[in-house]
Amino acid sequence: MRRIILASASPRRKELLKQLIGDNFVVYPSSYEEPPQPGLDPEELLLKHSVEKARDVAKHFDSGLVISADTSVLCEGEVLGKPGSPENAEKMLEKLSGKKFRVITGLTVLDLDSGKETSEFESTNVWLAELSKEQILAYVRTGEPLDKAGAFAAQGKGAVLVEKVEGDFFNAVGLPLFRLGKILERLGVSVFDEGFS
């Protein structure tokens, strides 16, 4: 069985990967700093970040598969990352309230044994309910939105704010499992192998 390395500190990505392959992976967060890249469209930027994260972690291992991802929310042409503060979370939720937007992820799998690097992009449409100021403030007070792209967690308390999801739901959580499964399959790794349980 191949060693799998998740290049992320995200508890959501860890839980999602665990759904696919059990505990058969190691977590090694990337130390890559995401510099501003003016002129790149959001998809290119997320792919670039996921590639750089995978390459950063790959330097610490001599074999296995490194999986990395970078996720943002795109609403009306604006990229919304993690808010980082309650004030920014409020602003983001006000912007997303009652709207359709896209959750976009750049995904990279780097095969250290063959040197093959696969990077792909996933997009999921999400419709957020019309939120009152009180709902926004109450949700922000939970602390949940502060470290989430777009200031909401589709898998947490934020689930009650989501009216509809079109596409890979798991992408809206932070790791597009369908696309990841297809990439792993092309690299000769099946999540249905007995070793992954």
Swiss-Prot record:
GO terms for molecular function: dTTP diphosphatase activity; nucleoside triphosphate diphosphatase activity; UTP diphosphatase activity. The record marks R12, T71, Q155 as: Important for substrate specificity. One of its GO terms (biological process) is nucleotide metabolic process. Its EC number is 3.6.1.9. The keyword DNA repair does not apply. It is found in: Cytoplasm. GO terms for cellular component: cytoplasm. The keyword Hydrolase applies. It catalyses: dTTP + H2O = dTMP + diphosphate + H(+); UTP + H2O = UMP + diphosphate + H(+). The active site is at D70 (proton acceptor). InterPro entries: ITPase-like_fam, Maf-like. Disulfide bonds: none annotated. Belongs to the Maf family. YhdE subfamily. PANTHER family: BIFUNCTIONAL DTTP/UTP PYROPHOSPHATASE/METHYLTRANSFERASE PROTEIN-RELATED, BIFUNCTIONAL DTTP_UTP PYROPHOSPHATASE_METHYLTRANSFERASE PROTEIN-RELATED. Nucleoside triphosphate pyrophosphatase that hydrolyzes dTTP and UTP. May have a dual role in cell division arrest and in preventing the incorporation of modified nucleotides into cellular nucleic acids. This is dTTP/UTP pyrophosphatase. It comes from Methanosarcina acetivorans (strain ATCC 35395 / DSM 2834 / JCM 12185 / C2A). The lineage of its organism: Archaea, Methanobacteriati, Methanobacteriota, Stenosarchaea group, Methanomicrobia.
